[in-house]
Regions:
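The feature captures the beta-strand-to-loop junction immediately N-terminal to the Walker
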Residues: 38-40
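Conserved ABC transporter NBD signature motif
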Residues: 61-69, 229-231
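H-loop/switch region of ABC-family ATPase nucleotide-binding domains
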Residues: 206-207
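Conserved beta-strand-loop-alpha-helix hinge in the C-terminal portion
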Residues: 226-252
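Helix-to-loop junction immediately C-terminal to a conserved catalytic motif
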Residues: 53
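ABC ATPase NBD coupling module
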Residues: 70-83, 91, 113-116, 120, ...
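A short, flexible loop at the N-terminus of ABC-type nucleotide-binding domains that lies
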Residues: 1, 10-24, 74
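ABC ATPase C-loop
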Residues: 162-163
Length: 264
């Protein structure tokens, strides 16, 4: 599970560039819950992800993962509990290494180091079984350099690596935004399958409102560092893009930008 209690973070405090990135944010995710997060640029979505991952430390408030306070925990230690996929397909893999070597690194996370060299046949078979679920033919290309894969293939591999050890929290940071529409749809479908299969507690940030509506069990909308809308269950299922935009206007008394970056 994941919990944020009264989390606030201000950048450039006391200067002309002061910005309240997060303001008294409270979130509680139960085990297996899938939360999608939307909002325009500067709403606080990325800062929220960084505070959870540990790459940004809040000024006030606390972050809990599996009922353990992790706010003072260094990012590299916190990463043992978190799987994260970034927007850039190049960010989650080592391009100069093979598919097999990348998977071996992901597999070794949270496990005791041994002196055994290479990858055992049993583990190689396991890697192939996991790759088969992607339906991209990567199970037959274990020796291929990851740098030679397409963006969609690399992002699918990143997603697989992030979920290999079934992390306490899976964070998806606009992980389909850099892909063409067909590959974005593929990665979206793979995401849905993996999250449901392993019942992963998931937080997904997206600019694509339709994606936020189609995926997940709960949705929050952020604006100016605050959560201004939080819906789940039947209420979320009945939402449309038009209703979301109208709700933003009702809450904020202003019109949300109606551009491609927001509507996807």
């Amino acid at each position: 599970m994941l919990r944020l209690d009264q989390v606030s973070l201000t950048f450039n405090e006391g200067t002309m560039d002061e910005k309240n990135a997060l303001q008294d944010v409270n979130i509680e995710l139960e085990s297996g819950e899938f939360l999608t997060v939307i909002g325009s640029n500067g709403a606080g979505k990325s800062t929220l992800m960084n505070v959870i991952s540990g790459s940004a430390i809040p000024d006030t408030g606390n972050v809990f993962i599996d009922n353990k306070a992790v706010t003072p925990m260094q990012e590299y230690k916190r990463s043992q509990m978190i799987g994260r996929v970034f927007q850039d397909p190049m960010a989650g893999t080592a391009p100069s290494m093979t598919i097999e070597e990348n998977l071996a690194l992901a597999w070794a996370r949270n496990k005791k180091r041994t002196l055994k060299p290479g990858v055992s046949k049993k583990r190689k078979n396991l890697f192939q079984e996991h790759l088969e679920t992607l339906n991209l033919g990567l199970e037959d290309r274990l020796s291929a350099k990851v740098g030679l894969l397409s963006g969609g293939e690399r992002q699918a591999l990143s997603l697989l690596m992030a979920t290999f050890t079934e992390p306490s929290i899976l964070m998806l940071d606009e992980h389909t935004a850099a892909l063409d529409p067909s590959r974005a749809e593929l990665i979206t479908n793979i995401t849905d399958e993996i999250v449901k299969k392993f019942q992963l507690t998931t937080l997904m940030v997206t600019h694509n409102m339709q994606q936020a509506l189609d995926l997940g069990t709960r949705l929050i909308m952020m604006d100016k560092g605050q959560i201004i809308l939080d819906v789940a269950g039947e209420e979320k299922q009945n939402l449309t893009i038009e209703k979301l935009l109208n709700e933003f206007q009702r809450i904020r008394g202003e019109q949300m930008a109606n551009d491609k970056a927001v509507l996807g």
